Structure formats: C-alpha cells, structure tokens
C-alpha cells in the first residue's frame, strides 16, 4: 500500500502572502485543519488550525477589539506557517508514513512528486483508508482467530475453510502476539 492510494489529491492551498484571516475562512468553509502553503508551484510550508490559534491574541490582552482586528487583518500566512515540513512521495509505503507520523507526532504530510505538491496525507485520510481496507462499512461477519503460530500452513488452513463455505474474505489482518 502506497500513500498515493490514500492521500487527498490536489489539496486546497494558499500562498505565503495570504492573510491569516483569509486562511481561517478557507479552513472553516472547507472543514479542513491544514493548508499547504505553495508559491509558484513550490511547497513553502504548512499552516494548521493550531498555528492559527497560537497566532491569535490572548483574551487577557490590553489591546482593544479594533486594534486586534487591525493586527490580524495584516498578518500573513508566511509569518506563522511551519516552513520546510516533512514530506512524503506518492510511492512512500503506507506503513512507513504511519511510523514516521507516530514517532514524530505529525498529523499530516504534504505529498510531493518532482518538486510539486500532488496531495496531502492526513489522519482523516488514514482512518478513511483503514476503514475501506478493513471492510468496516461492508456487510458480513467478522471472525477473530487467535493463537495461530504465524506459519503459512495456518493461513492455508483458514483459506481452505473459507473456500469450503463458499465465503468471500474482504479483509484479513494479522497482529503480533502480546508479550
């Protein structure tokens, strides 16, 4: 499984000169939490809802509402975006992306091919992909088989039983034994 199989292709983007207030509006209107920042076709960074919250003034500020609105209306994405985000290619194995995301606590990856942004892989994309891969929305029975030795002969036995009952396997997953 590769990232190309689960990423959001041609994601909504902004350029580095976009006003923060406009980026907030784009995120809200499209129900998204991240925006890649692209200038002249090249990825410059990424801005998240969290970045926008961090850039917002504290409620304890001594500035007036008008002063706050003025400051926010002038702030640009390039001032608060994360520059040079960790990226993936469309051919990155799904499992590797999952490992990197967990190890580095990253919730999304811009996907770049030949220097161009071609997609974004987010936590939501991963959940959607796993839901499809595991057949969660498909009708049928779920069977859990525990205690297998992990040998090919065990899998052959399972497939033989499934075939005897003229059943279709939509998905199969193997988990390591708990220590």
Where on the chain are the PLM-derived regions?
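Short acidic/polar active-site loop segments enriched in Thr and Asp
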Residues: 33, 107, 168
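Tandem CBS (Bateman) regulatory domains
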Residues: 1-10, 49-86, 93-102, 122-163, ...
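Short acidic-hydrophobic, aromatic-tinged amphipathic segments that line or gate anion-handling sites
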Residues: 14-15, 87-89
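A glycine-centered beta-loop-beta connector
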Residues: 27, 35-51, 101, 109-124
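The feature marks the first
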Residues: 3, 12-30, 36-37
